[in-house]
Amino acid sequence: IYVVPDNYLVKQVVDEAKRLGISVTEDRDDYNYSNSKAILVTSIQTVVNGYSYFGMRESGNYPIGSIIIDDVHACMDKIMCQFMIKINAETDAYKELIALFSSSLKDYNPKSYIDIVEMKDCRKNMLVPYWEWQRQHDNIYRILKKYNNSDNKEIYFGLPLIERGLETCDCIITASAIEISPKGIDLEKISSLEEASRRIYMSATLADDSVCLFLR
């Protein structure tokens, strides 16, 4: 599998490969790919998401033999976004989470609460205290599960990736969104990626060794 940061680059790689006479496909069900006669070119979001065909299904996950991740720094940024749930302020999920935390946030930091929730100041942000997040863990999960459907894609694709560590996640509230993100990235959930026999990372520079550790 050849993985790139976005769908525009998928098209670019496919066009160049065909020009060079290399057999490639964008279809994971392609016969030639299934029989190791063609390289699957896809985006990192296709590999890493809450319903990935490469490890998040109960059965029938697509195995990965060798995987090349091109522009690993950009792909790492995309992976971090995949593991974050961003809930827009216009949604009912946002309103219910604000209502859940309202009383404690007023007591914890009344000025920030007024700026963000009442005055809608987009320049401000507020971290939900970890003790309040853990105390409300079950109620948070109920709200996220309530809106865990294809109409709420951020929750739909993100929750399966972080639900196991939801209790220790950070939650940042702004006037425009709520962002829920884990302390670390658990790529073991993408089992086929974890079990790939060979992983190759490509970048113009790999000065930051943590990138390799992050994707090991």
Positions of the model-derived regions?
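Conserved Walker A/P-loop ATP-binding site and its immediately adjacent core
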Residues: 1-24, 46-49, 208-211
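Hydrophobic positions in the central parallel beta-sheet of the AAA+
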Residues: 2, 40-42, 67
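Short acidic low-complexity segments
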Residues: 26-36
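Conserved catalytic network of the ASCE P-loop NTPase/AAA+ motor domain
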Residues: 32-34, 57-61, 191-194
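Conserved two-lobed SF2 helicase motor
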Residues: 35-52
